[in-house]
């Protein structure tokens, strides 16, 4: 599989997993209800008009603009990946692909519904969804790849 295909397949799989999971939750669980009703791990159906940790509540236009910018940045990174050796690898392109998937997954909700469907609650952590997980895992993956590639290439500069 070519590296470009790796990027697009990881993006498509992430978007599909996000949108399918939200469809299943919306079709089977009333807003505000959870399974189980209490406990450390719950599946709960909530609408979030904000971003992570519910910041920017009610500012959908800013969140849509930020998401569009995120899509542009991810696509730009894909097209200039040859200049970023840590990114021009299968793991780098998978990480970038799931970042794009998370951004697009939540952007679809915001444009279509005016909010994001969240449904995973773990302990006291704010409720989140598959798109949020894609973003988090992708960003952490890219950071780790960057750090490892910096050490491997012998870059010891403090200007990171």
Curated annotation (Swiss-Prot):
Places the protein is found: Cell membrane
Organism encoding this protein: Dehalococcoides mccartyi (strain ATCC BAA-2100 / JCM 16839 / KCTC 5957 / BAV1)
Residue stretches spanning the membrane: 5-25, 60-80, 84-104, 128-148
Secretion signal span: none
Keywords: Aspartyl protease, Cell membrane, Hydrolase, Membrane, Protease, Transmembrane, Transmembrane helix
InterPro entries: Peptidase_A8
Function (record text): This protein specifically catalyzes the removal of signal peptides from prolipoproteins.
Catalysis performed (reactions): Release of signal peptides from bacterial membrane prolipoproteins. Hydrolyzes -Xaa-Yaa-Zaa-|-(S,diacylglyceryl)Cys-, in which Xaa is hydrophobic (preferably Leu), and Yaa (Ala or Ser) and Zaa (Gly or Ala) have small, neutral side chains
Record protein name field: Lipoprotein signal peptidase
Gene Ontology biological-process entries: proteolysis
Active site (catalytic residues): 118, 132
Pfam family, one: Peptidase_A8
Topology with respect to the bilayer: Multi-pass membrane protein
């Amino acid at each position: 599989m070519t590296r470009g295909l790796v990027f697009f397949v990881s993006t498509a799989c992430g978007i599909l997993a996000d949108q399918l999971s939200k469809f299943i939750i919306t079709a089977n669980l009333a807003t505000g209800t959870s399974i189980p009703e209490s406990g450390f791990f719950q599946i709960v159906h909530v609408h979030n008009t904000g971003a992570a940790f519910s910041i920017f509540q009610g500012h959908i236009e800013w969140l849509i603009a930020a998401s569009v910018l995120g899509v542009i940045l991810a696509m730009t990174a894909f097209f200039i990946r040859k200049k970023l050796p840590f990114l021009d690898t299968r793991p780098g392109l998978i990480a970038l692909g799931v970042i794009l998937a998370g951004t697009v997954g939540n952007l679809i909700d915001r444009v279509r519904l005016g909010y994001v469907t969240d449904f995973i609650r773990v302990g006291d952590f704010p409720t989140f969804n598959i798109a949020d997980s894609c973003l988090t895992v992708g960003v952490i993956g890219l950071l780790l790849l960057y750090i490892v590639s910096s050490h491997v290439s012998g870059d010891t500069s403090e200007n990171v």
